[in-house]
Protein backbone atom coordinates (compact mmCIF):
# COMPACT_ATOMS: atom_id res chain seq x y z
CA UNK A 1 0.00 0.00 0.00
CA UNK A 2 0.95 3.65 -0.28
CA UNK A 3 1.38 3.96 3.49
CA UNK A 4 3.76 0.99 3.60
CA UNK A 5 5.75 2.43 0.69
CA UNK A 6 6.15 5.68 2.66
CA UNK A 7 7.34 3.71 5.68
CA UNK A 8 9.91 2.00 3.44
CA UNK A 9 11.27 5.35 2.25
CA UNK A 10 11.51 6.54 5.85
CA UNK A 11 13.40 3.37 6.76
CA UNK A 12 15.96 4.28 4.08
CA UNK A 13 16.21 7.80 5.54
CA UNK A 14 16.84 6.25 8.95
CA UNK A 15 19.57 4.07 7.43
CA UNK A 16 21.29 7.11 5.92
CA UNK A 17 21.07 8.93 9.25
CA UNK A 18 22.59 5.99 11.14
CA UNK A 19 25.52 5.82 8.73
CA UNK A 20 26.19 9.55 8.71
CA UNK A 21 25.51 10.34 12.38
CA UNK A 22 26.74 7.21 14.12
CA UNK A 23 29.44 6.18 11.62
CA UNK A 24 28.00 2.67 11.45
CA UNK A 25 26.78 0.52 8.62
CA UNK A 26 23.03 0.19 8.22
CA UNK A 27 20.93 -2.54 6.63
CA UNK A 28 17.41 -1.59 5.66
CA UNK A 29 14.96 -4.30 4.72
CA UNK A 30 12.04 -2.61 3.04
CA UNK A 31 9.20 -3.63 0.76
CA UNK A 32 8.03 -2.80 -1.79
CA UNK A 33 11.25 -2.74 -3.79
CA UNK A 34 12.20 0.46 -5.53
CA UNK A 35 14.67 0.31 -8.39
CA UNK A 36 12.09 0.29 -11.21
CA UNK A 37 10.22 3.35 -9.90
CA UNK A 38 10.82 6.28 -12.22
CA UNK A 39 11.18 9.91 -11.13
CA UNK A 40 7.47 10.58 -11.75
CA UNK A 41 5.69 7.21 -11.62
CA UNK A 42 5.88 3.72 -10.20
CA UNK A 43 6.78 0.70 -12.29
CA UNK A 44 7.54 -3.00 -11.93
CA UNK A 45 6.06 -3.47 -8.42
CA UNK A 46 7.99 -0.36 -7.26
CA UNK A 47 6.16 2.72 -5.98
CA UNK A 48 9.06 4.90 -4.81
CA UNK A 49 12.71 4.61 -5.76
CA UNK A 50 14.07 4.07 -2.27
CA UNK A 51 17.76 4.11 -3.17
CA UNK A 52 17.43 7.16 -5.42
CA UNK A 53 15.44 9.07 -2.82
CA UNK A 54 17.91 8.08 -0.09
CA UNK A 55 20.82 9.28 -2.24
CA UNK A 56 19.17 12.67 -2.76
CA UNK A 57 18.40 12.84 0.97
CA UNK A 58 22.05 12.11 1.80
CA UNK A 59 23.16 14.95 -0.47
CA UNK A 60 21.25 17.40 1.74
CA UNK A 61 23.50 16.49 4.67
CA UNK A 62 26.60 18.58 5.52
CA UNK A 63 29.81 17.30 3.99
CA UNK A 64 28.12 14.88 1.59
CA UNK A 65 28.50 15.78 -2.06
CA UNK A 66 29.05 12.37 -3.70
CA UNK A 67 26.87 9.31 -3.23
CA UNK A 68 27.09 6.05 -5.15
CA UNK A 69 24.40 3.41 -5.60
CA UNK A 70 25.41 -0.17 -6.28
CA UNK A 71 22.54 -2.31 -7.53
CA UNK A 72 22.73 -6.05 -8.04
CA UNK A 73 19.60 -7.80 -9.16
CA UNK A 74 18.51 -9.97 -12.04
CA UNK A 75 16.63 -6.90 -13.34
CA UNK A 76 18.21 -3.62 -14.36
CA UNK A 77 17.25 -0.71 -12.09
CA UNK A 78 15.89 1.48 -14.87
CA UNK A 79 14.24 3.88 -12.44
CA UNK A 80 17.39 4.39 -10.40
CA UNK A 81 19.34 4.96 -13.59
CA UNK A 82 16.80 7.59 -14.74
CA UNK A 83 17.10 9.42 -11.43
CA UNK A 84 20.90 9.28 -11.32
CA UNK A 85 21.36 10.30 -14.95
CA UNK A 86 20.27 13.83 -14.04
CA UNK A 87 22.62 14.29 -11.09
CA UNK A 88 26.42 14.39 -11.43
CA UNK A 89 26.76 13.96 -7.64
CA UNK A 90 25.35 10.43 -7.72
CA UNK A 91 26.98 7.47 -9.43
CA UNK A 92 25.10 4.28 -10.31
CA UNK A 93 26.48 0.83 -10.97
CA UNK A 94 24.16 -2.03 -11.91
CA UNK A 95 24.88 -5.72 -12.40
CA UNK A 96 21.88 -7.38 -14.04
CA UNK A 97 20.86 -10.05 -16.50
CA UNK A 98 20.56 -8.75 -20.05
CA UNK A 99 18.50 -9.05 -22.10
CA UNK A 100 15.79 -9.35 -19.48
CA UNK A 101 13.00 -7.21 -18.02
CA UNK A 102 12.80 -4.21 -18.26
CA UNK A 103 14.98 -4.34 -21.39
CA UNK A 104 17.29 -1.52 -20.33
CA UNK A 105 20.83 -1.44 -18.98
CA UNK A 106 23.04 -1.87 -22.03
CA UNK A 107 26.72 -1.49 -21.26
CA UNK A 108 27.03 1.34 -23.77
CA UNK A 109 24.95 3.80 -21.74
CA UNK A 110 26.99 5.91 -19.29
CA UNK A 111 24.75 8.92 -18.80
CA UNK A 112 25.37 12.56 -19.58
CA UNK A 113 27.85 12.84 -16.70
CA UNK A 114 29.47 9.43 -17.27
CA UNK A 115 28.27 8.51 -13.79
CA UNK A 116 26.56 5.26 -14.80
CA UNK A 117 28.13 1.84 -15.20
CA UNK A 118 25.88 -0.93 -16.47
CA UNK A 119 27.30 -4.43 -16.29
CA UNK A 120 24.93 -6.75 -18.11
CA UNK A 121 25.46 -10.47 -17.55
CA UNK A 122 24.12 -13.44 -19.43
CA UNK A 123 21.77 -16.02 -17.99
CA UNK A 124 23.75 -18.73 -16.23
CA UNK A 125 26.32 -16.29 -14.84
CA UNK A 126 28.00 -17.79 -11.79
CA UNK A 127 29.44 -16.33 -8.62
CA UNK A 128 33.00 -16.62 -9.99
CA UNK A 129 32.23 -14.31 -12.91
CA UNK A 130 30.30 -11.95 -10.64
CA UNK A 131 33.31 -11.69 -8.35
CA UNK A 132 35.58 -11.04 -11.33
CA UNK A 133 33.26 -8.25 -12.53
CA UNK A 134 33.33 -6.68 -9.07
CA UNK A 135 37.12 -6.72 -9.01
CA UNK A 136 37.66 -5.54 -12.58
CA UNK A 137 34.78 -3.08 -13.08
CA UNK A 138 32.70 -2.25 -10.01
CA UNK A 139 35.49 -1.44 -7.57
CA UNK A 140 37.50 0.71 -10.03
CA UNK A 141 34.34 2.62 -11.06
CA UNK A 142 33.32 3.33 -7.47
CA UNK A 143 36.88 4.14 -6.42
CA UNK A 144 37.23 6.68 -9.22
CA UNK A 145 33.96 8.37 -8.22
CA UNK A 146 35.12 8.34 -4.57
CA UNK A 147 31.72 8.57 -2.86
CA UNK A 148 31.31 9.60 0.75
CA UNK A 149 28.35 7.24 1.01
CA UNK A 150 27.64 3.94 -0.73
CA UNK A 151 24.03 2.79 -0.96
CA UNK A 152 23.48 -0.83 -1.93
CA UNK A 153 20.24 -1.77 -3.61
CA UNK A 154 20.39 -5.54 -3.27
CA UNK A 155 18.08 -7.80 -5.18
CA UNK A 156 18.03 -11.44 -4.28
CA UNK A 157 16.40 -12.80 -7.41
CA UNK A 158 19.73 -13.59 -9.09
CA UNK A 159 20.24 -16.60 -6.86
CA UNK A 160 20.36 -20.13 -8.15
CA UNK A 161 17.22 -20.86 -6.10
CA UNK A 162 15.05 -18.33 -7.97
CA UNK A 163 13.50 -20.22 -10.86
CA UNK A 164 12.10 -17.07 -12.48
CA UNK A 165 15.61 -15.84 -13.30
CA UNK A 166 18.54 -17.29 -15.19
CA UNK A 167 21.52 -16.02 -13.18
CA UNK A 168 23.00 -18.71 -10.96
CA UNK A 169 24.62 -17.07 -7.94
Which residues does each predicted region cover?
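Conserved ATP-binding subdomain of kinase catalytic cores across diverse folds
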Residues: 7-21
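Conserved alpha-helical scaffold segments that buttress catalytic/binding sites
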Residues: 13, 17, 27-169
Amino acid sequence: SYEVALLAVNAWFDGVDVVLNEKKSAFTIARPPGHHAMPNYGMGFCIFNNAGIAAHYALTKPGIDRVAILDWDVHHGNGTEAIVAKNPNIAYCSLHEYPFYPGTGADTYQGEYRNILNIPVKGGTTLDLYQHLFEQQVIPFLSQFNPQLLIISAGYDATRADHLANVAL
